[in-house]
């Protein structure tokens, strides 16, 4: 069984923000036998799903399908969260707190932090990094999080005052699930992106010694890392392997020790091969985002028709060999926010009636699904196309592009439908970003006053009852306005062999290389 780490008791802690110093439990590799204390030395080969275009943290993604292994190795973290309890554990930061309900925060840093070029990692460095991510011209995937900040003010070397555009007492989670958590040397960034790619500078547990593009990255231990005796490893080799089957085969054959994983199919094969698997607990999931800014999905009937036309269990079989987790509700039953409110209804007869009604009005549902070339993404788009081909008055084309071409299309909102995700732990940081009309991360473009009001209420609610009532309305409105077809829970996971230990993930499947160590 794929190892899921969320329990009902732990999930109850997510109702309100808890700030503390206790971390998530570390877990081992393929074996659950005790392995003793961490051992320094040795090297590990790890796999990430997607190679970065640049090493500038503004261009990276801090999640399991992005470059979390790379970012955490090179830059370290300001803070992390425990996916089980959602407690915040401070790292290079020592405090991030609000005294006025999330209107302002004070970020405190450890004194004496330095980048590997000898320059200080101070409040000014955080200020400059966050300004860059908030610049729309940077095209950062973390713009939705950074854009919530109105201003930052350097108080002293270790103190940064953060003023929010709107109150958000849950903003710590927008740091842990984004590249706001990764701070690069401003002096190195000022030399330009090409120079930074050749010689990136962070304050993380490892430094980059070589980048063979389309192949691998080599890292060595940073002897001046702030959290001695970590890191335990002397070196890391980071490979880029986009295919899930190949990732499993490499671990099973001894070609790698750990891999970030996105695929339910690959996770099932990994367990069959005797490998270890760890899955970060999430609700929500991946969805077909219908662009409500333009036809045909500016008409809610078109959105409902497509939603009701699709058989999600068949998509699971075709795309994931039946191993995926099709979400029936926004929150899993273990969540304190769970309500038995269905995300979708398969109703082919009503779908065809709506397709016919729209066609009679001169508005047939013709659209293009923008997909990446990742195998499962492309397969999901193609099986969706095949299902809709069984209906009259609807036509779906598939356009598959590589990730470098996908990003500018996403930023420009130049698509009819594409795959997006809202993977829910602390609900505010995900749901507000994904579906609030003011959010720069609202890929569907949905604008619904009742949904907005509920998302705002969930963000600022001060009691479990207030937040629960708000997110019940959110669940109802997402069902009613239908901006998305939720087709699978995400699989933010790692696969491991039995000789690597100290595996810990924060937020959306972001592994922490500083804590890993090897035996054998």
Label each PLM-derived region with a short phrase:
Residues 494-520:
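Long beta-strand-rich cores associated with HINT superfamily self-processing modules
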Residues 223-269, 393:
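Ligand-site clamp/hinge motif
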Residues 298-386, 473:
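Append "and occasionally in soluble cytosolic enzymes with long acidic Gly/Pro-rich linkers
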Residues 47-98, 131, 201, 510:
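N-terminal lobe/hinge region of extracytoplasmic solute-binding protein
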Residues 356-424, 464:
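Ligand/substrate-recognition segments at binding pockets and active sites
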Residues 395-400, 404-406, 433-498, 520:
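Extracytoplasmic/peripheral linker and loop segments enriched in polar/acidic and small residues
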Residues 177-231, 235:
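Gly/Pro-rich hinge or "lid" segments in bacterial periplasmic/extracellular proteins
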Residues 106-108, 143-187, 210:
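Surface-exposed binding/hinge segments that line
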């Amino acid at each position: 069984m794929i190892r899921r780490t969320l329990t009902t008791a732990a999930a109850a802690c997510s109702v309100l923000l808890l700030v503390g110093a206790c971390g998530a439990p570390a877990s081992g590799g393929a074996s659950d036998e005790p392995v003793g204390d961490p051992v320094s030395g040795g090297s590990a080969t790890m796999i990430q799903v997607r190679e970065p275009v640049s090493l500038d943290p503004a261009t990276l993604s801090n999640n399991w399908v992005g470059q979390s292994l790379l970012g955490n190795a090179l830059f370290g973290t300001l803070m992390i969260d425990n996916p089980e309890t959602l407690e915040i554990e401070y790292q290079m930061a020592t405090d991030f707190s609000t005294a006025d309900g999330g209107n302002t925060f004070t970020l405190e840093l450890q004194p004496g932090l330095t980048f590997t070029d000898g320059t200080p990692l101070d409040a000014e460095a955080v200020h400059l990094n966050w300004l860059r991510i908030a610049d729309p011209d940077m095209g950062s995937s973390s713009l939705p999080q950074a854009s919530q900040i109105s201003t930052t003010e350097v108080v002293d070397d270790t103190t940064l005052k953060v003023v929010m555009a709107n109150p958000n007492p849950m903003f710590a989670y927008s740091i842990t699930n984004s590249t706001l958590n990764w701070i690069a040397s401003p002096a190195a960034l000022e030399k330009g992106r090409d120079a930074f790619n050749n010689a990136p500078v962070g304050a993380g547990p490892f430094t980059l010694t070589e980048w063979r593009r389309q192949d691998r990255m080599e890292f060595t231990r940073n002897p001046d890392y702030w959290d001695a005796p970590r890191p335990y490893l002397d070196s890391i080799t980071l490979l880029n392997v986009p295919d899930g089957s190949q990732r499993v085969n490499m671990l099973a054959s001894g070609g790698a020790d750990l891999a970030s994983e996105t695929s339910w199919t690959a996770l099932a094969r990994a367990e069959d091969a005797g490998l270890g698997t760890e899955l970060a607990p999430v609700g929500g999931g991946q969805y077909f985002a219908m662009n409500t800014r333009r036809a045909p999905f500016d008409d809610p009937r078109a959105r409902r028709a497509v939603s009701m036309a699709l058989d999600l269990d068949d998509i699971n079989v075709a795309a994931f060999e039946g191993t995926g987790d099709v979400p029936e509700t926004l929150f899993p039953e273990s969540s304190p926010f769970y309500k038995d409110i269905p995300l979708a209804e398969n109703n082919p007869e009503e779908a065809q009636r709506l397709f016919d009604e729209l066609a009679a009005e001169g508005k047939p549902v013709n659209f293009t699904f923008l997909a990446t070339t990742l195998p499962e993404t492309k397969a999901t788009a193609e099986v969706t196309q095949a299902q809709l081909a069984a209906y009259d008055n609807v036509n779906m084309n598939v356009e598959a592009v590589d990730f470098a071409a996908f990003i500018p299309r996403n930023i420009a909102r130049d698509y009819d439908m594409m795959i997006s995700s809202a993977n829910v732990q602390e609900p505010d940081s995900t749901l507000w970003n994904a579906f609030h009309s003011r959010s720069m991360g609202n890929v569907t473009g949905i604008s619904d006053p009742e949904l907005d009001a509920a998302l705002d209420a969930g963000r600022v609610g001060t009691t479990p009852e207030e937040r629960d009532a708000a997110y019940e309305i959110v669940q109802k409105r997402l069902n009613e306005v239908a901006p998305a077809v939720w087709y699978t829970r995400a699989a933010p996971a790692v696969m491991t062999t039995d000789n690597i230990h100290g595996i810990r993930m924060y937020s959306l499947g972001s592994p922490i290389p500083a804590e890993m160590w090897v035996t054998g």
